[in-house]
């Protein structure tokens, strides 16, 4: 009887033991598999390493590691020696060779096909096939692990509100030393909300953006029904209205398209576009209007080139051209600005035609999380000689009509955005969204910052001071988390020490760039089957893509062709910027209308 009791206790003890993979024993992208209740095995297949925990490099791997420079060294080389890079940029063969390396080295870090999601920390058909999930770069921490980060740290993470208040909230506006402006900030928000569309009814691990990439559903609508309501069904064009001699989106009343507006917004100011949340701020509606005009402009060009084409072919081909324009602008203007490189990035799909590359993409929840760049937002928005608070700006399309697109572009080109890394620069007005980002990361059981750094071939941080580059916030973080190996991903990205004169720290760039470039170049239009003139209506359509830039987009669609770029020409804080957000009028209770979208999209 006693023997049976001992056996029963032993069995119960084993069944309640922590998953042996909770300690993340497998290194260098080796995969941990439990074998019994207290044993594990690391699968080192094709990692270039071997041994019990995949820690011993193979011969060729050892040589590669000896020769490979650190990410910070590569960044330094690319952001210095301008004279050398000017020469490289003018030698097509050399420029293409370097660009090919940039694309392949980054894309290699992204699993394709996708592997995990919020509910499956192991390979499964469901994780591969179910498009309603965001994928994951790292599997979630197992439910049977003793602590939120596996085995390290306390059984509970620090209060998210306390983390927010101590190291994330803005004391005073910190401008981006890289000179990013509000044209950049709103482009980022507008562009990414075609694939960051969290389905909050199902949970933060789910998405409503089933295209998982650059499909321009934020222009054309996620569903066929929404698309049809937005289309004119004549000459391939989208519906529009003319106000003061200029083209703007149609109204909700005229299209019967669902948009999110507070009930007090007049019907004539409820513009209807592809993304239902773009009525939130006029900066988003500005870009929505520009792309509406661009689509209809391209339709006119194709109609002249192909009078034999019907409405459907004109519409579909114009959409493909706009996808191409978007990718080119993102790589050659947007990513170019973010990188700070003297090397000129190049959009050329043919660079990958002889490489092992999969033309598919799945958006990762970590990519969504790291893109929460709310520190970009200023305390007030300056248009012409007027200054608007958050409260005045929200759901106010009348500002767009009052000033017009020309003044919007000129003003946002001049107004500097905030620095994202370095801590304490999240505006008070969006603190609820930042807190939700922390809470949702916990709900999705993200692994620690250092596990993500190792996953993307970065050395783990050994202290909070190494993370922040200073002592005050490091001390706050140590009091909150106790162990650097327990530091959460999202807060870490915002407190990480920025690279010299840069908007981001190392982790943001080294995690974000692979997701971004794989998503852009994995688009079907970049494949050998699609990337040819006939796909885009001939040489005329192909030329529209290959000559696209943020400046040409503005010139072709905004009266007067105002100068624009993604950085201010003199990266200094604007004179009208509010100095202290915590003492300004942009308090959270001033922006009650955002309650309307909290359940729909914490990305905003």
Curated annotation (Swiss-Prot):
Binding site for substrate: 106, 341
Keywords attached to this entry: Acetylation, Dioxygenase, Disulfide bond, Endoplasmic reticulum, Fatty acid biosynthesis, Fatty acid metabolism, Glycoprotein, Heme, Iron, Lipid biosynthesis, Lipid metabolism, Membrane, Metal-binding, Microsome, Nucleus, Oxidoreductase, Peroxidase, Prostaglandin biosynthesis, Prostaglandin metabolism, S-nitrosylation, Signal
Keyword Transmembrane helix: no
Induction info: By cytokines and mitogens.
Compartment(s) of residence: Microsome membrane; Endoplasmic reticulum membrane; Nucleus inner membrane; Nucleus outer membrane
Catalyzed reactions per annotation: (5Z,8Z,11Z,14Z)-eicosatetraenoate + AH2 + 2 O2 = prostaglandin H2 + A + H2O; (5Z,8Z,11Z,14Z)-eicosatetraenoate + 2 O2 = prostaglandin G2; prostaglandin G2 + AH2 = prostaglandin H2 + A + H2O; (5Z,8Z,11Z,14Z,17Z)-eicosapentaenoate + 2 O2 = prostaglandin G3
GO cellular component: cytoplasm; cytosol; endoplasmic reticulum membrane; neuron projection; nuclear inner membrane; nuclear outer membrane
PTM entry text: S-nitrosylation by NOS2 (iNOS) activates enzyme activity. S-nitrosylation may take place on different Cys residues in addition to Cys-526. Acetylated at Ser-565 by SPHK1. During neuroinflammation, acetylation by SPHK1 promotes neuronal secretion of specialized preresolving mediators (SPMs), especially 15-R-lipoxin A4, which results in an increase of phagocytic microglia.
Binding site for heme b: 374
Enzyme class label: oxidoreductase
Mutant lacking the gene: phenotype: Mutant mice exhibit defects in colonic mucosal wound repair.
Official protein name in the record: Prostaglandin G/H synthase 2
Name of the coding gene: Ptgs2
């Amino acid at each position: 009887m006693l023997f049976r009791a001992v056996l029963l206790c032993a069995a119960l003890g084993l069944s309640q033991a922590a998953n042996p993979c909770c300690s993340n024993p497998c290194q260098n992208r080796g995969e941990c598999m439990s074998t019994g209740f207290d044993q594990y095995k690391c699968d080192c297949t094709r990692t270039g390493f071997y041994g019990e925990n995949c820690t011993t490099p193979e011969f060729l791997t050892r040589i590669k590691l000896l020769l490979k420079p650190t990410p910070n060294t590569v960044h330094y080389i690319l952001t210095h020696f301008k004279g050398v890079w000017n020469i490289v940029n003018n030698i097509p063969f050399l420029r293409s060779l370097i660009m090919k390396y940039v694309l392949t080295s980054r894309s290699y870090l992204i699993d394709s096909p996708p592997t995990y999601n919020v509910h499956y920390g192991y390979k499964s058909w469901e994780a591969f096939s179910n498009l309603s999930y965001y994928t994951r770069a790292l599997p979630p921490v197992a439910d049977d692990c003793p602590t939120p980060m596996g085995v390290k740290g306390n059984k509970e993470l620090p209060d998210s509100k306390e983390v927010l208040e101590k190291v994330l909230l803005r004391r005073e506006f910190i401008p981006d030393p890289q000179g990013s402006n509000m044209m950049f900030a709103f482009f980022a928000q507008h562009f990414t909300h075609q694939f960051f569309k969290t389905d909050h009814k199902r949970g933060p691990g789910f998405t409503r953006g089933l295209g998982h990439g650059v499909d321009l559903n934020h222009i054309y609508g996620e569903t066929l029904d929404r698309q049809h309501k937005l289309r004119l069904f004549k000459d391939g064009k989208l519906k529009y209205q003319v106000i003061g001699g200029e083209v703007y989106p149609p109204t909700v009343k005229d299209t019967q398209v669902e948009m999110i507006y507070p009930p007090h917004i007049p019907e004539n100011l409820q513009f209807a576009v592809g993304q239902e949340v773009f009525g939130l701020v006029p900066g988003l509606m500005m870009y929505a209007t520009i792309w509406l005009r661009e689509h209809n402009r391209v339709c006119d060009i194709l109609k002249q080139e192909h009078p034999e084409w019907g409405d459907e072919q004109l519409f579909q081909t114009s959409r493909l051209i706009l996808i191409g324009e978007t990718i080119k602008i993102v790589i050659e203007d947007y990513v170019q600005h973010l990188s700070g490189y003297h090397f000129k990035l190049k959009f050329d799909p043919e660079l990958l035609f002889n490489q092992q590359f999969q033309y598919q993409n799945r958006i990762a929840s970590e990519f969504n999380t790291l893109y929460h760049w709310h520190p970009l937002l200023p305390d007030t928005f300056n248009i012409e000689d007027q200054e608007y608070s958050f409260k005045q700006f929200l759901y106010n399309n009348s500002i767009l009509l009052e000033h017009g697109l020309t003044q919007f572009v000129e003003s946002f080109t001049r107004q500097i955005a905030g620095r994202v890394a370095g801590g304490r620069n999240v505006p008070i007005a969006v603190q609820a969204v930042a807190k939700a980002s922390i809470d949702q990361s916990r709900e999705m059981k993200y692994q620690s910052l250092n596990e993500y750094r190792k996953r993307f071939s970065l050395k783990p941080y050994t202290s909070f001071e190494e993370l922040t580059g200073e002592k005050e916030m490091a001390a706050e973080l140590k009091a909150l988390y106790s162990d650097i190996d327990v530091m959460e991903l999202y807060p870490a990205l915002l407190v990480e020490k920025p690279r010299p004169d840069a908007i981001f720290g190392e982790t943001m760039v080294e995690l974000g760039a692979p997701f971004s470039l794989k998503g852009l170049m994995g688009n079907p239009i970049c494949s050998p089957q699609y990337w040819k003139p006939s796909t885009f209506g001939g040489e005329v359509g192909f030329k529209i893509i290959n000559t696209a830039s943020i400046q040409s987009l503005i010139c072709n669609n905004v009266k007067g062709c105002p100068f624009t770029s993604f950085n201010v020409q003199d990266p200094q804080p604007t004179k009208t910027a509010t100095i202290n957000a915590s003492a300004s009028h942009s308090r959270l209770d001033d922006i009650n209308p955002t309650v309307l979208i909290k359940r729909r999209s914490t990305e905003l």
